Structure formats: C-alpha cells, structure tokens
C-alpha cells in the first residue's frame, strides 16, 4: 500500500449534480480536482425522475414568491426562509443556464420548456396546483447529470474516479486537504487543497427499504462529524410515498403529476379524505402518512394488507409512453406488471435526507451552533443542510438545490482560494489512515467482527423504529 501525494488549490468530493456544478464554477479560476468513488455519470443524481421547479410561467401565471411560500409551508415552516428565497429566486436563471448548456427539456407546442404539476406546488399561495416542474420526460436527473458532466469534460476538469475520500486534514481550524483510498489499487492518496467541497449525497442506506443507491452512505457528513462538526436536522428524513412494494425503487411524483391516483384495497381514492383540495398531489410527508395510516387501519392491499395501489390505467397508453417511459419500464422489469392495464403496488420508501452538514447560503460549513465558519470547507446538495427543506422537501426542489447551491459552493471556493496562499502538508500526512486501514483488515479476521452484520442490524433497527411514525427509542 503506497502513499501518493497530489497538490491542488481546491478539491470537490463527489461528482453528482452539486459537485459537478461547483466544479464548473471553480475550475476556470484554480487548479481543481474532483474526487468520486463512482464514475461521475453513475452518481445518484441520475436516478431523479420528475423535474426541477422554477417559476417560469410557461403554462400559467407563476412567480418565485409563490414557489417560496410553498417551499416554506411544505417544510412545516422549519426551513431557513432567506435561504428559500435565494433557492426560488435563482431557480429561473438556473434552468435557463442548463437549457443553454444543452439540456434536452421536454417542450410545449410553442417551443418553451414544458412544465407540469408536482406535489405541494401551488399558485396564489395554495389556491390550486401549479405547473412549475421543468422536466425531461421522467429522466430529468439523468439529463442534468449528463449535461453538467459534458460541460466539465469540455472545460478539462480533472477527475479522480473510483477514489473514496476517508479523511479531511484540518490543522489549527483550517482545511489543508483530504486523504482518499484508490479502490482499484488499495493505495492511499493525499490531496493538498486550500478549499474542499463535500457533495457526497445522502445516507439512505441506513434503511433496509430505500430508493437510494448502495453508494449513499453519508460519507461527507460522517467525515466531518468525526472531526467534531455538529450535524443539523438529522431527525428529518423524507419517505417518498410511492416506492415499488418491497423494492424501494422510486416511482416519481411525475406519475401523479400526470394524473395517477392512489387507491386502497377497496379501490377508493383515499387522498380525497386527507387532502380534499390537492388530493394525490399533497406534499410527500402528508401522502406518506396517509398511506401508512391506511395500512395501519387495515385498508392496505395484498395478503398482508401492507401496500396501496398507484393507478395509471385511466391515463391511456400514449400518455404513459410519452411522459412516463422510465417509470413504466421499471414496473414491467421488476414487478412484471403492465401499468397500462393494472395498478402498481407501492409503499413509502426512505428517500431523502433533509439534514446534514450545516452551511450558510454560500455553502460555507458552520462548525458550531453560533455559526462559526470552518475556513476552506464547503458543502452542497443532499449532504448539506442550509436549510431550504426544513422538515420536508417538496418534490423537484432537490435538483434545484444541487444546481443553485452547487454554484454557490464553487463561487465560495474561488473567493477563498484567491485570498489565501499555498502550503504543503507533511510527508507523513497519509500514514495515520494507512495504519487505520491495516488495523481494520486485521480485525476482519476476528469471527466476532462483521461489517455486513453491523449494517444489517442498523438497517433493521432504523426500519423498525425510525420510519414515518416513531413510537419508541432506538436500541442498537
């Protein structure tokens, strides 16, 4: 196991939407490296289906103040309202910027970017559902990821693919770089850097049934927590109402935005009882609680009464084919159901972390409850908590979040690097991590030590005690 040293001005950890957008902003102004444990286009941003909200008003009257109102209300009024205003105000230019970079948005007949309804988004502060979500069929995240990655490639951004960052170097309260493990060789790589942005995504794999990929293990928050940085809003975890039964694979809100209906075992459109005005397009927390309530009251479907149905059969084959192609392919592949003819079994699935690394609106990491800035360290996207989502995120605001605050993280890196001088880390900067890895490898031979068992026990405990309704303390 070798220790290899690199020197950069800035490092971005993670190559999903937030990391790539930060790289686009920072790369022209510094020597920059993007370190990712996956190939960039395999990042989880690509799994996002439904859309990215912005008050473009292409279909009907809209403005960013209404978007902001909905976001704050949907958060149970626990979001940071100045940050929400920034998110919603900058959304419009962010969508236009992506369009100019080549993102193939779906279009209206007049050529403008198409927009559709999404849960919790309304016009005139709750009067009716809003057509606000800009989309590319039902593969919006995939298109955003591809567009941002191609922009990075065209700019000559340096990538270190399949490197897992395991540690950050902070000396005297100042960032000095990161240490990573090269997955292919087992070598340790030390990256000197004055500025580091964590854009490592969420941590949904703490749950057994999750929409998250296996790679979403909370790397960024975990690394900083071990350095004494307190995490924010960790109790707020979103459960998406419509995951494929038992699998957790997400069926986007786009399906309900196009007219899909949730039904219980009796075929009743039960959301009419829980949200009479917006029904199936209520915010995700409300819909997930409604489904959980239906199941607990014996109205769930199936032999165990533990799921409900998402009914698309009334939409027609042409609408399903044109607007929901990926969603319906998932259903055909994984549950062998033809959604044109049969309703789909769904259940709430662990989906999105509202909490994470505390930051200000410029993506600067805060090291304590007083808002003290940790010099040179930034975070954006799901790994960060700014907090624009409060206790519940509205659908389509996550893709918006990564672009708006990814850009701000890149700008902050540029400002910081331009005002500081280069330095050198000690020659043995990676030795402590090397020793930890060797000790871990030796421990693997202990029959009483099993990483898979620890993970399974964690997932079982979270699944039982920390889902939609939490009635007891967790004991691990």
Regions found by a protein language model. Give the residues of each.
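Core beta-strand elements of the Rossmann-like FAD/NAD(P) dinucleotide-binding domain
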Residues: 6-8, 186-195, 373-374
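A glycine-rich dinucleotide-binding beta-alpha-beta segment and adjacent secondary-structure elements
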Residues: 166-175, 180-181, 323-384
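Glycine- and aromatic-enriched mobile tails/lids
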Residues: 1-8, 17, 25, 39-41, ...
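Glycine-rich active-site loop/strand segments that organize a redox cofactor
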Residues: 54-87
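Conserved redox-cofactor binding core of oxidoreductases
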Residues: 99-187, 192, 199, 240-247, ...
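An anion/pyrophosphate-binding glycine-rich loop and adjacent beta-alpha core
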Residues: 223, 229-345, 412-418, 455, ...
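Glycine-rich loop(s) and the adjacent beta-strand/alpha-helix scaffold that form part
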Residues: 195-249, 395-408
């Amino acid at each position: 196991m070798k220790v290899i040293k690199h020197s950069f001005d800035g490092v971005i950890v993670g190559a999903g939407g937030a990391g790539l957008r930060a790289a686009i902003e920072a790369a022209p102004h510094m020597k920059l490296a993007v370190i990712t444990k996956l190939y960039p286009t395999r990042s989880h941003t690509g799994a996002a289906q439904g859309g990215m909200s912005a008050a473009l008003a292409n279909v009907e009257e809209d403005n960013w103040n209404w978007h902001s109102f909905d976001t704050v209300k949907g958060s149970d009024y626990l979001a940071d309202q100045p940050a929400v205003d920034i998110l919603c105000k900058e959304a419009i230019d962010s969508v236009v910027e992506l369009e100019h970079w080549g993102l193939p948005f779906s279009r209206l007949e007049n050529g403008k970017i198409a927009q559709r309804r999404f849960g919790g988004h309304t016009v005139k502060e709750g009067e009716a559902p809003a057509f606000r979500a800009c989309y590319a069929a039902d593969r919006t995240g995939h298109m955003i990821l591809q567009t941002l990655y191609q922009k990075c490639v065209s700019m000559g951004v340096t990538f270190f693919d399949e490197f897992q960052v395991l540690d950050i170097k902070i000396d005297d309260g100042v960032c000095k770089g990161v240490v990573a493990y090269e997955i292919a060789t087992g070598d340790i790589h030390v990256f000197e850097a004055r500025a580091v942005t964590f854009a490592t995504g969420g941590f949904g794999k703490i749950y057994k049934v999750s929409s998250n990929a296996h790679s979403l293990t909370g790397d960024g928050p975990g690394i900083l927590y071990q350095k004494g940085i307190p995490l924010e809003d960790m109790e707020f975890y979103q459960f998406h109402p419509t995951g494929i039964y038992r699998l957790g694979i997400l069926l986007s809100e786009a399906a309900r935005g196009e007219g899909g209906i949730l039904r219980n075992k009796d075929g009743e459109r039960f959301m009419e009882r829980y949200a009479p005005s917006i029904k199936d397009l209520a915010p995700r927390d409300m819909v997930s609680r409604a489904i959980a309530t239906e199941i607990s009251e014996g109205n769930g479907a199936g032999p165990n009464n533990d799921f409900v149905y998402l009914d698309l059969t009334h939409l027609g084959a042409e609408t399903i084919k044109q607007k929901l192609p990926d969603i319906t392919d998932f259903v055909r592949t994984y549950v062998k159901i033809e959604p044109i003819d049969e309703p789909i079994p769904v259940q709430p699935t662990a989906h999105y972390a509202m909490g994470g690394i505390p930051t200000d609106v410029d993506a600067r990491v805060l090291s304590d409850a007083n808002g003290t800035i940790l010099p040179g360290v930034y975070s954006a996207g799901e790994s960060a908590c700014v907090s624009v989502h409060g206790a519940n995120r509205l659908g389509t605001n996550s893709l918006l979040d990564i672009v708006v605050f990814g850009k701000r993280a890149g700008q902050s890196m540029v400002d910081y690097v331009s005002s500081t001088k280069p330095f050198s880390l000690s020659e043995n900067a990676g030795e402590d991590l090397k020793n930890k890895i060797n000790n871990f490898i030796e421990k693997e031979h202990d029959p009483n030590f099993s990483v898979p068992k620890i993970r399974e026990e964690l997932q079982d405990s979270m699944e039982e005690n920390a889902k939609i309704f939490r009635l007891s303390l967790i004991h691990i």
